[in-house]
Amino acid sequence: MTTDMDLEQLEYEKEVEEIEKWWATPKQSQIKRPYTASTVAVLSEVTKAYYPSSQQALKLYDLLREHRNKGTATLTYGVVDPVLASQASKAGLETIFVSGCLCGLSSVDEPGMDHADYPWDTVPKAVDRIFRSQNWHARRQKQFHLMKPAEERKQLPKYDYLLPIIADGDMGFGSVTSTMKMTKRFVESGVAMIHLDDLAIGLKRFTVGQGRTVVPTSEYLRRLTAVRLQFDIMKAETMLLCRCDTDHAEFITSVVDPRDHAYVLGATTKIESLIKALKDAESTGVSMKKARENWIERAKLMTFDEAVKSTATPKEYENYISAISKKPFHSISERQELAEKYLSNEVFFDWELPRSSDGQYFFKPTVQTVIERAIAAAPLGEMTWARMDYPKWQDIKAFHEGVRAVYPDRMFAFGFTGNYDFKAAGFSEEQLRNLTSDMAKLGVCWQVQPYFTCQVLNKASVDYSNIWKKDGIFGYVKTVQEPALKEDVDGFENEWCGTYFADKLLSAAGSSDKTIPY
């Protein structure tokens, strides 16, 4: 006789088998999970559901793989508005991006700069709104086409309104479980891919250009694992873009992970702590900024390896570097032991002295730092994105070639900022013209301008507001209305507004009126 417990065990074993079979499919087999199928089966949802997110993710995956194989790229921009999303489809874009920064400026009760301090469901809600509008546009287009004769239908334009949505997951908004809840909401909203970064929340000081802080490598991987686990629990094909914001970071929250130790800065002179120096400056009326700069100069901040180099003879340093090259990562204590072994003089190094009032450690990342984090994260996601707000071609090239040395077929993303002066950074006009295609050859198959909505629309709004203010309705008709009517810009057409679709709904629902006896 089969008991309820026996049935439960059989269902569990069947689910484990189904999960393992799913993980063996081409897309899923690339992911290396630190947990088992049995763990997922224990945590999985009891009521099974299929999420449109999976359909969109598979569509996106095939699109990106095709571009990656051809050495080309698909380009898009950041949107938070359903109307703009529909225009991306009309323009022939293949994806759209929902930026957390733009949502934080436009879709919340209390706007703010890019601290990711808005509610965790802000971006999922924006995705949900856009995805619903995409479905509506696809439906009303289908209905309009099918009301026409076959020959006439062939002449009608047809747009792909169901563009896959890539969305900003920021840093996951807190603990593992809050990250998983956010991920669940994203999947339910219809997103095709989300990205998660390695930043610490709310520590940037924008006006002085300081404060970019990353979390330890282990915490970054824990965030990504939480997202992947939630995808698996929901049986979702949703893609994960592993974004690394370590480039130009100044601080790290913790030194718990030996993989980060090579890049942590310490004082190499025996002085008071930075916090004490700043307190003394405050009490005497000295500028905190100047006091900080003075302390950093006196502390002679270096990484431990730099401190070794400044202390050792050339031969001693050569022996030290040879010793630490025998394995990928050495903790600070291992480095200190090797320094004691190979150097005749003591190396003074204290990474506690420079710690900030927020507890941050000074950090000195290099392109190699970003490469190491990206390689560590790659098994958990389908794509990699190294955020470079101040990109230099040699750094872009070095990063992507460094990761491809380990993962030759890796797909990459890249985001362009809205205020970076490419000319001042040494890019010629010809280099800038070819930048998109040159990066595509490095495997960067998805490229985005996240701040499009702010920069382009703000500029257009000011330009046309000035015309309206100066020339009134005459200016509007001449500069907006007449060109829009000539160019078939969406706005009030019966088809785009869904009037035919609405009338069809009314007609279908009113079919029973024919049965009313008169």
UniProtKB/Swiss-Prot annotation:
InterPro entries: ICL/PEPM, Isocitrate_lyase, Pyrv/PenolPyrv_kinase-like_dom, Pyrv_kinase-like_dom_sf. Keywords: Cytoplasm, Lyase, Mitochondrion. Its EC number is 4.1.3.30. GO terms for cellular component: cytosol; mitochondrial matrix. It catalyses: (2S,3R)-3-hydroxybutane-1,2,3-tricarboxylate = pyruvate + succinate. It is found in: Mitochondrion matrix; Cytoplasm. Its main location: mitochondrion. It is an enzyme of class 4 (lyase). This is Mitochondrial 2-methylisocitrate lyase. It comes from Schizosaccharomyces pombe (strain 972 / ATCC 24843) (Fission yeast).
